[in-house]
Regions:
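Short loop/helix-cap segments at secondary-structure boundaries that form the rim of catalytic
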Residues: 51-58, 70, 111-113
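Conserved beta-strand elements of the Class I
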Residues: 17-18
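Short N-terminal or domain-adjacent regulatory/targeting segments
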Residues: 1-14
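NAD(P)-binding Rossmann-fold cofactor-contacting core
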Residues: 25-28, 35-55
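A short helix->loop->beta-strand "cap" motif at the edges of active sites that frequently abuts
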Residues: 40-42, 94-99, 117-119
Length: 140
């Protein structure tokens, strides 16, 4: 499910992103990707139960996907492969349209559950790499 056409469709049909595993530390990949996505015009909601109530890049951090105040287009997962399964299940439960597992994050049983539930899923890729590679225009 992580072919270029699927990646393009997910990115072009996404405006609202819940970024699970968001970090306030500028040297962390989750911070850098969140910053990049925001600069591309995506509306990004940081999710991290250990940082709930804090702010990252001017956005209030929530502890769970349930606390994101709008419908979620994509859940971007910065968790390890084992923990990603629970996040995929949460994404299914809250009605997200797609799930994106970052570089190095692969969970095939979770991928199957997402597909069965009708979600698009991308594994082992980074949107901050794929957007310029595919020439995806900023969100209007």
């Amino acid at each position: 499910m992580s072919d270029s056409e699927t990646i393009r469709q997910v990115l072009e049909n996404t405006k609202i992103i819940a970024l699970v595993g968001a970090s306030p530390k500028p040297h962390r990949a989750s911070y850098q990707v969140m910053q990049y996505l925001m600069h591309q015009g995506y509306d990004v909601y940081p999710v991290n139960p250990l940082k709930a109530g804090d702010t990252i890049l001017g956005r209030s951090v929530v502890s769970t996907l349930d606390e994101v105040p709008v419908a979620i287009d994509m859940v971007d997962v910065f968790r390890n492969s084992v923990d990603a399964g629970d996040v995929v299940d949460d994404a299914i439960r809250v009605g997200a349209k797609s799930v994106w597992l970052q570089l190095g994050v692969i969970n095939e049983p979770a991928e199957e559950r997402a597909i069965e539930a009708g979600l698009a899923i991308v594994m082992d890729h980074c949107p901050a790499i794929e957007i310029p590679k595919l020439g995806i225009a900023p969100v209007a």
